[in-house]
Amino acid sequence: MEDGDFRRRPPLWTSYFSPEEVCFLTTVHTLASGSSGNALLLSCGESYILLDAGISCRRITAALRELGLELGSLTAILITHTHADHISGLQTLLKRCAAPVFTTERAARELSWRLPGAETRLDALDFGIPQSIGEFAVTAFPTSHDAPGSCGFRLDAAGGAVGVLTDTGYVTDEAADILEGVDLAVLEANHDIETLRSGPYPYYLKQRILGAQGHLSNEDAARFAAV
């Protein structure tokens, strides 16, 4: 596909928000987390962003209803990467709500191949360039993971700045720069290195998890969080 096959939104070049604009708090709800599925809901004002859809549409719907929301309340869907535990509910979700889907160009290409018809709903984000999505300015940054175009996100709104960094073998320089100064960071802490090495997983899986395109260890996550 050519670049024009995915819609691009104009960047938000401003320095975001003055103190006088703070009318709402940004909130983060974990709908699911772990190897069986991942999904977050971020909200500010009347904007609701679903970040990853790694559980069934039914579970997402039920979780939203517990918060007094419906699928139609969603402003947008953000996808970090195309592994099943982050997109397993996306195809059904696309049939049941009209929210646009934002991800990186390489991930968008993968989704368009794996999910027939999805290409008409995908918006490609460029790394490091903020995009205005509802109340949020969303900035994607690259992660080091074995999925095409994998990324994390910084979301700035009047109610605060949130960074989301999951599924990465290490914290890239771009990630560290973009996440500087956030009010809240949602950070992967996947494993204790020695417990993993001595555990029951097969050798190839241990090597994948420990590799540069695998998952962030508890030690590395703590080290980054302390900076």
Where are these regions (language model features)?
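Targeting/processing segments of secretory and organellar proteins
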Residues: 2-4, 8-9
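Conserved beta-strand hairpin/beta-sheet module of binuclear metal-dependent hydrolase folds
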Residues: 16, 20-67, 151-167, 184
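Active-site neighborhood of phospho(di)ester-bond hydrolases with catalytic His/Asp-centered motifs
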Residues: 51-54, 74-82, 102-105, 163-167, ...
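Active-site metal-binding motif and surrounding structural segment of the metallo-beta-lactamase
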Residues: 58-103
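Short, well-ordered alpha-helix to beta-strand connector turns
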Residues: 74, 119, 182-183
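Metallo-beta-lactamase
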Residues: 105-159
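Cap/insert and terminal regions of metallo-dependent hydrolase folds
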Residues: 173-227
